[in-house]
Amino acid sequence: SLSDKDKTFVKAFWGKLKGKADDVGAEALARMFGAFPATKSYFAHWPDLSAGSGPVKKHGKIIMAGVGDAVDKIDNLVSGLSKLSDLHATKLRIDXXXXXXXXXXXLVTLAANFPADFTPELHVSLDKFFAAVGAALSDKYR
């Protein structure tokens, strides 16, 4: 679970990241498609899955808005992300394991874009945060 220290690290880093969130989201999404090709199946209707394509940029922005929402609700992710969890489980029917693939791509993207900030301590805190977000998003699957 997230300690107070983890929450402090995540909130502080989000403050630095916010201005580049849309670009980071598109890059992380494109990275996920390359590293985890099975995730492309949810977006087969998009002709271009690169970070520069319109649909990837748009969805990257949506994802990062969700991450920002999770940061705001970091003290109660299951309740705070309940509607998003329901959307993923019932309407979009996204495999809950895809969250782990998205988290791995996001961590690599964040490390590449913020090398000076991406300390081992931040890495651990972000990893725990993304795991908690993934668990909250998969809550409606149970």
From Swiss-Prot:
InterPro entries attached to this UniProt entry: Globin (IPR000971), Globin-like_sf (IPR009050), Globin/Proto (IPR012292), Hemoglobin_a-typ (IPR002338), Hemoglobin_oxygen_transport (IPR050056)
Q: Does the keyword Cell inner membrane apply?
A: no
What is the protein's name according to its record?
A: Hemoglobin cathodic subunit alpha
SUPFAM superfamilies from the entry?
A: Globin-like (SSF46458)
UniProt: heme b binding residues: 88
Q: Name one GO molecular function term.
A: metal ion binding
Q: PANTHER family, per this entry?
A: HEMOGLOBIN FAMILY MEMBER (PTHR11442), HEMOGLOBIN SUBUNIT ZETA (PTHR11442:SF41)
Additional remarks = This fish has two types of hemoglobin: one cathodic Hb and four anodic Hbs. The cathodic Hb displays a small normal Bohr effect and a reverse Bohr effect in the presence and absence of phosphate respectively. In addition, the cathodic Hb displays a large phosphate effect.
Q: GO terms for CC?
A: blood microparticle; haptoglobin-hemoglobin complex; hemoglobin complex
Chain positions recorded as O2 binding sites: 59
Q: How does it assemble?
A: Heterotetramer of two alpha and two beta chains.
Job description of the protein: Involved in oxygen transport from the gills to various peripheral tissues.
Task: Cite the entry's keywords alphabetically.
Answer: Acetylation, Heme, Iron, Metal-binding, Oxygen transport, Transport
Keyword Heme assigned to the entry: answer is: yes
User: Which species is the source of this protein?
Assistant: Ophisurus serpens (Serpent eel)
* BP term (GO), one: hydrogen peroxide catabolic process
Q: Which family does it belong to?
A: Belongs to the globin family.
Tell me the domain of life: Eukaryota
Chain positions found as N-acetylserine: 1
Changes after translation: Acetylated on Ser-1.
Q: In which tissues is it expressed?
A: Red blood cells.
The residues covered by the Globin domain are: 1-142
Question: Which Pfam families does the UniProt entry name for this protein?
Answer: Globin (PF00042)
